[in-house]
A protein has these predicted regions:
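Flexible, polar/low-complexity N-terminal or interdomain linker segments that lie immediately upstream
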Residues: 1-50
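Short active-site oxyanion
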Residues: 33-39, 56, 85, 109-110
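Short, acidic/turn-prone active-site loops that include or flank metal/cofactor-
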Residues: 62-66
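Catalytic cysteine-centered active loop of the rhodanese-like fold, especially the PTP/DSP P-loop
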Residues: 73-114
Length: 114
């Protein structure tokens, strides 16, 4: 049986981009040394090995995001307890848009993405 997908990834990303603030690279470069911002790298281990990451960024594989944010999860990471702005990023701004929207819906704030 063929599945009837009623909302594809493009629509989900569009909704996320309508909801969450998007920063451009130039804006982010000025924030890299600002301690009020935490950069969250959503790429997987292979991407990090191949391409590296922003110095000081926290690596959070996309598949673990909700578990690491939720304080009731046994996988919770304390980095998500801070009163800072969370800047999510990935390779194409797709995962980062979806992640920032999800994090916002979970109550993490403020959030944005590259």
């Amino acid at each position: 049986m063929v599945q009837n997908i009623v909302k594809g990834y493009k629509a989900l990303i569009h909704e996320a981009n309508e909801t969450v603030k998007t920063l451009n690279v130039e804006e982010c470069q000025s924030l890299l040394k600002n301690e009020d911002y935490i950069f969250i790298d959503l790429r997987d281990f292979r991407e990090l090995q191949r391409e590296g990451k922003i110095p000081g960024a926290f690596s959070c594989p996309r598949g673990m995001l909700e578990f690491w944010i939720d304080q009731e999860s046994p996988y919770h990471k304390a980095i998500f307890n801070q009163d800072k702005t969370y800047v999510f990023y990935c390779a194409s701004a797709w995962r980062s848009a979806l992640s920032a929207k999800t994090a916002s819906e979970m109550g993490l704030a403020p959030v944005c993405h590259i």
